[in-house]
């Protein structure tokens, strides 16, 4: 297992859940956290602990976003009209790295961030190398012509473990995707239950 995979699956082990629904997750074989003390029975979490865990799980799912960046996203979500938890999910799903992952151009969130940083993605015909770039409905995302035959791309499009959600239209023959709309929490194909309302409670303490 590579260092990148180890870091990724460490999040699974810490949460005790296969948060991306990957067949190779070690949580599929055991239900305790990482490290030598991972097998110890855990007591019931306090309300604060439950809220913190919900935040850590969502941050981890989106390739371990830093606390500073995640809190900034939360603040932005609170400024928008409507439910803050729903807005939080909407902003996260509009991130370019999330859309690249959802479109099955790469196999993981972590790979999507690296793929974008290395300049393999265009938005509306222009190269964008910022993973946190906010995609808008109607935007067209594409893999650069020179990158379409990379093994990481060809393998990802064949993954049977997940489908492209209906708020994204993907054409793998052309390696393009169109972002149709901002999804609601219920639209997002999370492998485990995400609870943004608990994150709102956490930051509202």
Swiss-Prot record:
Boundaries of every S4 RNA-binding domain copy: 94-157
Alphabetical list of SMART domains matching this protein: Ribosomal_S4, S4
Coiled-coil ranges per UniProt: none
Any one GO cellular component localisation term in the record: small ribosomal subunit
Start and end residues of each stretch annotated as Disordered: 18-46
Keywords attached to this entry: Ribonucleoprotein, Ribosomal protein, RNA-binding, rRNA-binding
Disulfide bonds: none
Matching InterPro entries: Ribosomal_uS4, Ribosomal_uS4_bac-type, Ribosomal_uS4_CS, Ribosomal_uS4_N, S4_RNA-bd, S4_RNA-bd_sf
Quaternary state and interactors: Part of the 30S ribosomal subunit. Contacts protein S5. The interaction surface between S4 and S5 is involved in control of translational fidelity.
Family: Belongs to the universal ribosomal protein uS4 family.
Protein name: Small ribosomal subunit protein uS4
Gene name tied to this protein: rpsD
